Amino acid sequence: MRDSHPVEQTVGIEYYVTETDGTGGRLRDRPADFRVREREAFGADCRPLDADPGSYPHLVFRATLREWDTNDFASAVSNALGVSRERVSWAGTKDKHAVTTQLFSVRHDDAALPDLDGADIEPIGRAGRPVLFGDLAGNEFELVIRDPDRPEHAEATAAELCDFGGGEAGVPNYFGTQRFGSRRPITHRVGLDVLDGDWEAAAVRYVCESSEREPERTQEVREGIDADRDWAAAGERLPGSLRFERAIANRLAEGAESPDDYRAALEELPSNLQRMFVNAAQSYVFNRILSERLRRGLPFDEPVVGDVVCFSDSDGNPDPDRTQTVTESRLETVRRHCERGRAFVTAPLVGTETVFGDGEPAEITREVLADVDVSPTDFELPGEFGSSGTRRAVLVTTDLTVEQEPLTLSFSLPKGSYATVVAREFLKADPEALS
């Protein structure tokens, strides 16, 4: 186990689990170097394209996107069709600098969809409900590592990951740095402001806090707005690409006197982005819990007394709604379930209904929460900001293959797990090389 990159440590990712020196190199030298294809799980809800739009109002389509941010693509579709952005939904958010194939739906009577640069769009049917976030079994990845310094180290790293995963390649199920903002990893800090009830700090941080990884001009604009708080001018000064920051600034220009004004400004964002802030805070706490579990030497592929495990669903993936706290008397039985892939050790994505478990795992969670000054009751928040919490497996295993010339990693992951968390163990590089 070795210390991670300093940028990763700011989002709770404190260690690598492999000791082999990194291959070096970089991902995403070109979009085709990072390919993602969803393993779809929506077929049973889909009807033919000629189904009655009155009964099946949601048009379901598959899109292969090249260098499209998911939110930007949804906005482009809604604008082209002349419908509300909230009518467009999707199964999973993907990386922009990639070639991705994923499922969307739009509430729209006409089966015709727009032609957009960098997008191949295939209508596949109609449904009585929208495609919702999480309506997928997982994702298949093919990642090319360009210009590695030590490509021969990849096989040794893969072998170490198999040891960590208990026979199959495994990594801690960290949330990757892109969860928090690839260039400006602050969404968890905005979320912590929200949990603290400081709506002003949250809105101001999102608009004004700069990062040295951003263009110099963008840094200057953010810092200038922070200094003068001239929200009326801010909407014009911010680059057009920062449309969410502009939306917040424009709302604050109408009034920035009370906490409710700042909360209303954050509510100008699409609902999924409103949820993103508290979700990122939960993810940060989760990463911290995993790092402390690693530091203490607790296993990831099998439980200890006090762990909360969840059981597998019909697809063999973790089902966070079916859980059990591991007692001394049940330890060996649950270990066998984990060994056979029927149960998974979990940690909490903390919310109002979080169950801590017992023993050392619960102690870790409480220590991390105390350190970030968060409690489950803090998640009792209005609208999209509140969360009851859930659980997430601490380990993710995969059918990893490694090929040389060019160095290529191929694997699949369950929904919600990050390809860069696998890739980082190989490159051991600045997270910017992964993004």
Curated annotation (Swiss-Prot):
The organism sits in which domain of life?
A: Archaea
Which positions are catalytic residues? D95
Q: Which residues form the TRUD domain?
A: 170-396
Question: Would the keyword Isomerase turn up in this protein's UniProt record?
Answer: yes
Reaction(s) catalysed by this chain, per the record, are: uridine(13) in tRNA = pseudouridine(13) in tRNA
EC no. given is 5.4.99.27
Which InterPro entries does the annotation name? PsdUridine_synth_cat_dom_sf, PsdUridine_synth_TruD, PsdUridine_synth_TruD_CS, PsdUridine_synth_TruD_insert, TruD_catalytic
Per the record, the GO terms for biological process are:
tRNA pseudouridine synthesis
A molecular function GO annotation: tRNA pseudouridine(13) synthase activity
Any idea which UniProt keywords this protein has? Isomerase, tRNA processing
PANTHER family attached here?
PSEUDOURIDYLATE SYNTHASE PUS7L (PTHR13326:SF21), TRNA PSEUDOURIDINE SYNTHASE D (PTHR13326)
Q: Do you know which NCBIfam families this protein is assigned to?
A: PRK00984.2-3, tRNA_TruD_broad
Role: Could be responsible for synthesis of pseudouridine from uracil-13 in transfer RNAs.
Q: Which family does it belong to?
A: Belongs to the pseudouridine synthase TruD family.
Name this protein carries in UniProt:
Probable tRNA pseudouridine synthase D
Upper classification of the organism:
Archaea, Methanobacteriati, Methanobacteriota, Stenosarchaea group, Halobacteria
